[in-house]
Amino acid sequence: MMIHIHQDKKMSTRSNKKSTKTEKVAKATKPVENVEVSDNEVQEQAVKTKASGKKVTAKSTKQSGGKNAKSGSKSAKSGSKSAKSGSKTSKTQSGGKGDESRDRYFKLIDAKTGRSFGRYTGGTPKQAASKGFTKMIHKIKAEGGALPKNGTMKIYLRESTRGSPRKVYAYEATRKQLTEPQKIEIEGSDGKKKVITYRYRNVIHKVSAPLPNQLGGLKTSRSNKKSGETKKSGSRSSGSKRSAKPTKSAKNAKSTGNKKVSTKSAGAKKAPAAKASR
């Protein structure tokens, strides 16, 4: 009888284990109940999602905006640098020493007396010489004088522009008659247009020969005078320094000469002493 009871206990434990397993499976496979959600809860959830989306977009826009601002500042800096470089180039183009487009002023010089007269403008001394040459010819014709046979004249100009070195320029000018006269319209000081006819053309060449003594000879500018004086003074000072300082070879030659003289004098003194002993 005891054996049957023990077997029944085993069977009961097995059945209990199976029942617990089935309960667990039933719990896991419970059907999902239909949950009723009100409209207010749905709206609240939508508002929350919208707010979170705004925060995310705001953060992203802030980050992108900061980067764009940095890049914008860099571009602004580069723009300012380019503007500075542009201002430098405009300065060099508009004015300065290297600007050849600005007007310069010159005066004609009489080679015999050395007096200057007239005032002629031009970007280069050659242009001013052409204007001065035409003025001289008109003056000679008005006074009834005779033009030179060759038709060539020497013209001397001195620059009178403020800040210039007052350099003197020499040119040879001739006239050539045109086959057909040229007519050019020019607006006068009163605002009316005037027609000027040109029958001659000026041909001007620079003269490389030295200037007359009345005009200062070769000394055509103040800068050349100053440079010549400094060169002369420099050569004199260098010569005096060289003569004052003796070289090492000269010192060595003097010392060897003194040694030879001393040895000769010693030999001369010893010779008579030997003769006396004999």
Swiss-Prot record:
Location of the region described as Disordered in the Swiss-Prot/TrEMBL record: 1-107, 206-278
Highest taxon in the source lineage: Viruses
Biased composition (Polar residues): 249-260
InterPro entries per record: MC1_sf
Positions of disulphide bridges: none
Stored SUPFAM superfamilies: Chromosomal protein MC1 (SSF102875)
Any single biological process term in GO: DNA protection
Composition bias type Basic and acidic residues, residue spans: 1-11, 97-107
Skewed-composition ranges (Low complexity): 62-94, 264-278
Protein name as it appears in the record: Uncharacterized protein R252
Upper taxonomic lineage: Viruses, Varidnaviria, Bamfordvirae, Nucleocytoviricota, Megaviricetes
